[in-house]
Amino acid sequence: MQILLAALVAYLIGSVSFAVVVSAAMGLADPRSYGSKNPGATNVLRSGNKKAAILTLVGDAFKGWLAVWLARHFGLPDVAVAWVAIAVFLGHLYPVFFRFQGGKGVATAAGVLLAVHPVLGLATALTWLIVAFFFRYSSLAALVAAVFAPLFDVFLFGTRHNPVAWAVLAMSVLLVWRHRGNISKLLAGQESRIGDKKKAAANGGAQDGGKL
């Protein structure tokens, strides 16, 4: 019962879509209506508003970190922490507050990993940054980071008595699945690079005074 309740709370935390909330608060178009139609920081950046993209990134990462931190703070066992990690991630992917139309989970996964262990989170984030810097594809960086995250976890903590390792693996598999469309575009040479701006509809990306 304790695990179920913790997972439910984590799912609700994950269901807060900062891309949609921040965009609405700043008078921007719904990120689900332009660009990749993904409610995430990369797509919000396509609106031309860097501040909104940064706030989205921080918010999505924070909720992942918060859910796991709360589980640890209240002394829940590792099995519960593992379920909390998966639940907050699923909340971001399929948010109950936004008709289950969520993002792809990169920032939220990063927040979860940072809460599991700072070294794990930083190693995975560094992997993303290196790939993104050299190739300028957010999706490719996310896919590579998703592959390496479980490997980093096993290297740092092993698999014995480590249920969180299975949660990390599950998140990685889900993240790759959510990027299946991006994989097709990458193979076809049609994927957008970081920094590409796609005009938003209705009060969207090219709003006056909105670009930073």
From Swiss-Prot:
Its EC number is 2.3.1.275. Pfam families: G3P_acyltransf (PF02660). GO terms for cellular component: plasma membrane. Pathway: Lipid metabolism; phospholipid metabolism. It is found in: Cell inner membrane. The keyword DNA repair does not apply. The chain crosses the membrane at residues 3-23, 51-71, 78-98, 115-135, 139-159. It catalyses: an acyl phosphate + sn-glycerol 3-phosphate = a 1-acyl-sn-glycero-3-phosphate + phosphate. It is an enzyme of class 2 (transferase). SMART domains: G3P_acyltransf (SM01207). Keywords: Cell inner membrane, Cell membrane, Lipid biosynthesis, Lipid metabolism, Membrane, Phospholipid biosynthesis, Phospholipid metabolism, Transferase, Transmembrane, Transmembrane helix. One of its GO terms (molecular function) is acyl-phosphate glycerol-3-phosphate acyltransferase activity. GO terms for biological process: phospholipid biosynthetic process. The keyword rRNA-binding does not apply. InterPro entries: G3P_acylTferase_PlsY. It is a multi-pass membrane protein. Probably interacts with PlsX. Belongs to the PlsY family. Catalyzes the transfer of an acyl group from acyl-phosphate (acyl-PO(4)) to glycerol-3-phosphate (G3P) to form lysophosphatidic acid (LPA). This enzyme utilizes acyl-phosphate as fatty acyl donor, but not acyl-CoA or acyl-ACP. This is Glycerol-3-phosphate acyltransferase. It comes from Burkholderia ambifaria (strain MC40-6). The gene is plsY.
